[in-house]
């Protein structure tokens, strides 16, 4: 009896999912670089603060965007942010955003989120994820015809630690590789403190 097909099935279903660092590069809905340990999209999104630092889409006269977690529920994997936006004119405005799981994996862990503001829906899927950064694919619109897509690099407070220099370069390289920006837009996360 030829056991080769059974070995192949075992390799694909058991060995490869347990060794993500050994798998070849490719896009999966949720990935991690594994160096700081696995985090879920909800864990990253519910960090105290997250900051947009790069996008492949321009957001007009915006200097920085900071989202502060205002509420979270680990059981339902929902959360709310107060999103602070600073304009080039140094004027601030804030808005509230609530996120609900859009998809979950077999373990019930949210792998993507959705947020609704009026009649506009924004969906967030995670192309690459680690404890201090996430590369997020964002789809926003009120209908399929109105859909705008972007790819963004978000970081949390861990990104600003002094021992994070090499990690900063790596996450920016990953942004360029995964988002393939024709025109890369950078945002000032270092001076993005909420207004007084």
Map each language-model feature to its residues.
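A beta-rich soluble binding module of mature secreted/lumenal proteins
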Residues: 2-196
């Amino acid at each position: 009896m030829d056991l080769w097909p059974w070995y192949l099935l075992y390799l694909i279903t058991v060995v490869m999912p347990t060794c993500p660092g050994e798998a070849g590069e490719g896009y999966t809905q949720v990935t991690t670089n594994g160096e700081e340990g696995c985090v879920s999209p909800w864990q990253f999104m519910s960090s105290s603060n997250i900051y947009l630092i790069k996008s492949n889409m321009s957001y007009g006269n915006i200097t920085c965007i900071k989202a502060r977690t205002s509420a979270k529920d680990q059981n339902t994997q929902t959360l709310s942010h107060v999103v602070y936006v600073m304009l080039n004119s140094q004027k601030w405005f804030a808005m509230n955003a609530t996120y609900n799981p859009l998809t979950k994996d077999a373990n019930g862990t949210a792998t993507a989120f959705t947020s609704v503001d009026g009649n506009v829906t924004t969906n967030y899927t995670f192309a690459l994820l680690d404890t201090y950064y996430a590369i997020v694919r964002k789809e926003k619109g009120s209908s399929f015809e109105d859909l705008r897509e972007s790819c963004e690099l978000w970081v949390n407070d861990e990104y600003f630690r002094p021992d994070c220099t090499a990690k900063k370069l790596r996450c920016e390289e990953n942004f360029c590789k995964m988002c393939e920006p024709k025109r890369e837009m950078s945002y000032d996360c270092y001076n993005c403190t909420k207004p007084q």
